[in-house]
Curated annotation (Swiss-Prot):
Gene from which the chain derives: JBP2
Protein name according to UniProt: Bifunctional helicase and thymine dioxygenase JBP2
UniProtKB keywords: ATP-binding, Dioxygenase, DNA-binding, Helicase, Hydrolase, Iron, Metal-binding, Nucleotide-binding, Nucleus, Oxidoreductase
Annotated Pfam families: Helicase_C (PF00271), SNF2-rel_dom (PF00176), Tet_JBP (PF12851)
Span(s) of short sequence motif DEAH box: 681-684
Binding annotation for 2-oxoglutarate: 479
Gene3D superfamilies given in the database record: 3.60.130.30, P-loop containing nucleotide triphosphate hydrolases, Tandem AAA-ATPase domain
Record region (DNA Helicase): 541-1098
Organism this protein belongs to: Leishmania infantum
Amino acid sequence: MLNGLTRVSTSSELESILDIVQSSGEIAVVFTSPSIGDLETITSETQRRQLRIAGIPRGGYTILPAIPLYDDELLQMCERYTSANEYEKAEMRNSLYMREYPLFTYSIRHQRALFHPADYVSRILQFCSYYVQAPDADVLPLQDKSPFLHISPIKEICKHLRLIARGTPVAPDDSESPVPEQLRLHAESDAEKLAAERATAMSIATSSGGASETEQPSLFSGVAPSALFQKGAVEEVDKDAEDTMEDLTGEETVDAVHSFQAEYLTLDGFELVTKASIYYDREGEGQRVVAVYIPGGVPEDTCRAAAAVLEPAATKKNLRAPTNGGLPPDTGIVGYYDYLTNPTQHKCRETEYSRRNWGLLAQSEPLLKHLDKLYSQLAPMHHHLQRVAIPSQYQLCGTVFSTITVNRNFRTAVHTDKGDFRSGLGVLSVINGEFEGCHLAIKRLKKAFQLKVGDVLLFDTSLEHGNTEVVNPEIHWQRTSVVCYLRTGLMSSVCEMERRKHLNRLILLQLLNTEVRNTTVNINGADSSLPPLFVPTRLASHLAPVQLAALGFIVERTEKQSGCVVAMTMGLGKTLVALTLCFSQLHLAPQADILILTPKPIISHWVDEKNKWGMHGLHFPHFVASDGLNSLEFEQQLLEYERQRNNEKPKLGHIFVINGEYLAGFLRRFKRFTPLLMIVDEGHRVAAKGNKLTESLDRLRCNLRIVLSGTPLQNDASELYRLVGWVNKGVSRVLPPKRFQELANDINQFVEGDDGAFYNAVMAQEYIQDWMRGFVFREMENDLPPLHDYLLICGSSDVQREYEEKLGLTETAMTALKATEHRPHHLSTHPACYLAFISDSYQSMVSGWTVRAQSNTSRPRVSQLEEIDTMRLEQYVQLVENEQLDAFIDLSGKMRVLVDIVLRVQARKEKLIIFSLYVGSQDLIHRTLTALRVCTFTVRGRDSQDRRRRAMQEFSENKDLIVLVLSTKIAAYGLDFTAANHVVLFDSWWNPQVDAQAIARAYRRNQRKPVTVYRLISATENKFVLRSQTRKIALFKCILHERTSRQALPDELEDCAANEKDEERRIFWAKLKTTSLAGDSRALLNVYRYQESVRESE
């Protein structure tokens, strides 16, 4: 092993020298020679191994190991180390051995490391500390002695920190600036300057022919910077539009006023509070903090210094006249705001005043820091949740505040503040003025808080509040107050995608003119305040903007040890988002384990996605997936993992993809299993009350919990509350379950048709949306082709009507029939299906084996058919055997409509999926279509994963295979059938999200055609299912789509057959409406657009 600086004779071979440097961590000096090679040979081989090269001593070159840290990490470490005392330095050196070094693992590759990367980092820190503090006389000789001063970024970091230590200002425009711009790249101007400087530097290096240092390996391999991201994922800046539109948007509605006439409060009926106190919204269970009063909380001189720069922000250019008696008050917004409803190029950005006065606003930092400290001390859980939620780039002076509202001489009428983070509190303080009165009164508490200069009030801004009267208003009075808070709109998917596009643009500018360097790229690398997010470079261009935004949202929460819910509509690629997250986590912590919990039918989908994207660099050496069967391969993988846990082999990170049923057994086998990250697919299952799965998961010590679900809200709003509470336990401490249920009840009351509940529903809806934004990434929209979704109300044949009357299919009777399992859906499918079902057995029309009709000994069942029923069943079988198919089909309205839809799709040379919940219906459909010579394939819930995979492949590749018949509740999950652009829901389930999952098998990413959905509704059981569905859809829209919605009344639904815009469909509807069933009733009674079954309120 080499010691210190080793001279290598010219007879040594270059390969052996580089092997020694790479494995031992020592440095070596080489000279060009026939046996070593020329400069080009030395530099190219050094670069290939990711080693570093410095142009000293004179005539020779020094080879150094790869630096095992990223540039920004090294800069931060050197900053802390050079300013630390000796004890703190020793602590830092010790801590170096406790962290991961993914760059080191990659650079060593197949070599066996004979040193710890912490040793090398420690040497760099020690040298940097010496350089920063060295006398001027000692600095110049170091240039010829230390190779560290010849390689980036060490040389730039050392010179930069020395300038700071000496009090010398760093000129960013100086071409000799010691710190590379990429270390502090944040603004567009910085990025553009970097690109120009880098191009100039390369030109100079080429012309000089010197080699002070070989270029570091690039951030990625085989991908040009221009091809790194897909079109639409990078910010496009239109300077002309920005100049004309940015300053038109300083106005935004920030208050919710609840009446047309402003209501002003007086002290009458309010208790004046003058002493420090904390208030709750109720006594006993379910209470929550709503106000904390701190008189004299901030020194007056701190307040007045901040007032000098904040007061000019308060102008009459605002939309707050309704809370000021009809006249615009003097008020303004400082910091960041979400201009979601304005025609701006940037929806989330600095306010106009902030953009023009950032330099002056530094004088308000002591005030903000003081308020932030009070907040963390007196409402620690609210403060913690707000710190978790706030995006780092929107933090004002490192606090949990993104925004400040400045009010001057403004006595507000009663209002609530819109868009504030509801798991946090607003922080109000008076910072200047001479006045009497004008207390802040909160109606619900019946308290008025005296606020003089320096007094502070933390309070729930969703409660109605306003100022009391000013004493002696005829005397000139002055009062300036500020409210500091977090705007939840800054965490919307719109803002997340906008921010992601901006970061992508900076990354491209940062990588401009660089050489190929690595197979991964840190797509958060343009902003050092963000946690790293590593993505395979060949994969990045396949990630849609919404997927990149979701990844950014997740890693910001995991960095703060919080989980989150990813609520992306089906088909937007949640699985790829999750796998990319796993890649980044394992890149940073290669020995960590990750647990992915998913329903059994979807496990193969995860494996397929892993294999598919592995071709684009998404590699996982230890990806263990099983449905719980003790297969040989799975057992071998578990044994290998066991050996690593027992230290028999080096520990490597594993990803386990398992189903909930196997989880308990897995945890029994691997006690003290502690995953770094836990992902729950179709995570709405976690929200069920008394869920054993949740109990098992809660036993795992893992704070980083990610829930994936396109349908996080299935039946009621409390499910969303339990989901968010599961990913972040602190939520229930600031919003108790009882309070959330009250909000949910307000929404439910309106959804179910009580128009008088509209006002309360809107308030509750806004509160829940503002509460969940910090923990739920929502993207319910998509850029897919059009979706045409229809409700087809099918008629009944005379035989069906006869049995309907016999069964008494009223709504009351429907409930009774459900209890005894006489399912009217069999009758709506076909009389033959119904008669076979009640006889307790029928011959499967696909496989030829007898099915016991899902029999259950605990269920009463008619065991014998009446004679007429037996004759009819035999007659129906004869119709099929004699190929009198039209007569057989015309016995059912739904079957007649279905067959005509299938024949239309076949004539158009397109493909169709038919979903049904019931085996009897699936069999009957399959046999009927097969008899009609329509090529059909059926996939049921009991079918193996291999059969499903073959069905997918066959359906995609075989142009003759027109129809797939699938089980709705099982086969709908985890399958991709985008070859079809027509979907029939032959029957519907009480939970509309089950149907939504089914539709998403065809209506998802990679679908290139418009998709038409046909929901077949009979006059028997389905109308009650529909009523349940529309209520839940209205609730879903209220909470996740931010649209106040309710069920449509029967007389509000309009038959769209006659006014259908598509001529071919209009003709088709008309044909079905004139088609007669047995008994002369119409096959199709009405056609409605499904989206109109739920009405949105303005």
